[in-house]
Amino acid sequence: MAALKEDRSYGLSCGRVSDGSKVSVFHVKLTDSALRAFESYRARQDSVSLRPSIRFQGSQGHISIPQPDCPAEARTFSFYLSNIGRDNPQGSFDCIQQYVSSHGEVHLDCLGSIQDKITVCATDDSYQKARQSMAQAEEETRSRSAIVIKAGGRYLGKKVQFRKPAPGATDAVPSRKRATPINLASAIRKSGASAVSGGSGVSQRPFRDRVLHLLALRPYRKAELLLRLQKDGLTQADKDALDGLLQQVANMSAKDGTCTLQDCMYKDVQKDWPGYSEGDQQLLKRVLVRKLCQPQSTGSLLGDPAASSPPGERGRSASPPQKRLQPPDFIDPLANKKPRISHFTQRAQPAVNGKLGVPNGREALLPTPGPPASTDTLSSSTHLPPRLEPPRAHDPLADVSNDLGHSGRDCEHGEAAAPAPTVRLGLPLLTDCAQPSRPHGSPSRSKPKKKSKKHKDKERAAEDKPRAQLPDCAPATHATPGAPADTPGLNGTCSVSSVPTSTSETPDYLLKYAAISSSEQRQSYKNDFNAEYSEYRDLHARIERITRRFTQLDAQLRQLSQGSEEYETTRGQILQEYRKIKKTNTNYSQEKHRCEYLHSKLAHIKRLIAEYDQRQLQAWP
């Protein structure tokens, strides 16, 4: 579309595409070849009788684009469909269309929120073009470079000492052997032969074992696996038998074509495989700890066995990353995140935009619940299989876990859990928010502690601040005069005073889920986690959609001066939105409390599994 001009105002309208219309908006990610096909068709579409078409088949489909050079033929590109709103509640955005009205004015129209993403898969010509570009770049580099042989370098077979006899002097020991010069070319050939003999140790092994030990480190695509096998030597017979072998020992992913070694095959992996480097052996050690601690009777995971873990999840040091690797669609909620310590006191922090503040500026919905102790160091957990992997990016449960990447230090760091009192989600509570606050003069049920003059002055200064800065639902003594009793918080959150900071009853999951002592118990906990995580994600997505409008209005209100006309108008919009949500979402309060409960429960199960994996890794010889 045309670029927007500076210093010019545009009107933005919504609703041209109603909810009952047949128009859907998608976020489309094209490859270079697909983009060129579209541009070629648009440039000469008048001369082509066919029209582009798109067909959906579940979460997959294909796009057909006519070729101007061959009017009777069309290029077909396959794609897969992913849900942005479900995988990442904060990653969706709106689709804006720019058009010119009949009067010649430029308008912007919001067509709706983009919840789905179409990703076009790469074709063979894309890989062929990439290979040609790499070969051309390598040839140019080789033509401008030269091999410099240095003393002690890789091309020098051994150090040679040249000894010149003294002139005119006879050798006192005729039988002494003298060092003779060594031809440099022969030394290079010998060193190359020794390197080949080292690699031949792997090439002489059975082809099945070679494939099995490569897949034990990380998932491979078939093309990547062929390139890796060719380094150690690959015959045509082995190449032809690769497809059948992969069906026996690996799980094939229908989405990105990656091959992951089956869990039952890890028992045949040798830790002293000659093709493994020291780093590969350390990586294999961590993988075996995770795989072998699970009961073999469980077989594959609860999900589709073909849904193997994404490439790059394990063993990134084994081979360099590939350009066309697809990013993983999910992130393990039990995976290790960067070490982070929560600092929550008895007075809960104000909730802003539906989330609790974190000292380092990042956003977290909840601290990790822990046992009734001051702090509790959570042992880092190795990655779990894909069924436990929830959607990525800003996941509320992922925020309470540690992710140390794949640097080989998975179990050397920990996360400090929050104290036992659980802070509730700072999201709009549509019930029990209109209770009037207690006047200052009313007696309290329990006698408060005496406070120093310094603390009293601080509290008095905090109370004198404008109410617009406090995320409160209930009107208080210092509220704006004339505000109705059901005035919501300016960002849609409940009063901090309405959020309990402690509980008199022990949650049922603390009694049900104790420390893990066996692999069967660990598998049972993991199954319980998988059973309730989908419900938690759905609840969180619905709550996020409700609070998004309050977040936008709160940001506008903070930029206005209190008492101005714009301030009162925005405040009226907040009240209107609050009443609207209260009517249309009668079960919001129950869903919010259910989401908080599931968050604490799943975080507790995650911590127990992480501690068990840490103990298993420490006990590994």
From Swiss-Prot:
Position of sequence motif Nuclear localization signal: 445-459
Q: Where is the composition biased (Basic and acidic residues)?
A: 406-415, 458-467
Give the UniProt tissue specificity note. Expressed in all tissues tested. Highest levels found in placenta, skeletal muscle, testis and peripheral blood leukocytes.
**GO aspect biological process, one term:** transcription elongation by RNA polymerase II
Annotated InterPro entries? E3_ELL-like, ELL/occludin, ELL_N, Occludin_ELL, WH_DNA-bd_sf
* Record note on quaternary structure: Component of the super elongation complex (SEC), at least composed of EAF1, EAF2, CDK9, MLLT3/AF9, AFF (AFF1 or AFF4), the P-TEFb complex and ELL (ELL, ELL2 or ELL3). Component of the little elongation complex (LEC), at least composed of ELL (ELL, ELL2 or ELL3), ZC3H8, ICE1 and ICE2. Interacts with AFF4; the interaction is direct. Interacts with EAF1 and EAF2. Interacts with ICE1 (via N-terminus domain). Interacts with ICE2. Interacts with USPL1.
Briefly, what is this protein's role? Answer: Elongation factor component of the super elongation complex (SEC), a complex required to increase the catalytic rate of RNA polymerase II transcription by suppressing transient pausing by the polymerase at multiple sites along the DNA. Elongation factor component of the little elongation complex (LEC), a complex required to regulate small nuclear RNA (snRNA) gene transcription by RNA polymerase II and III. Specifically required for stimulating the elongation step of RNA polymerase II- and III-dependent snRNA gene transcription.
Task: Indicate what this protein is called per its UniProt record.
Answer: RNA polymerase II elongation factor ELL
Q: Which organism is it from?
A: Homo sapiens (Human)
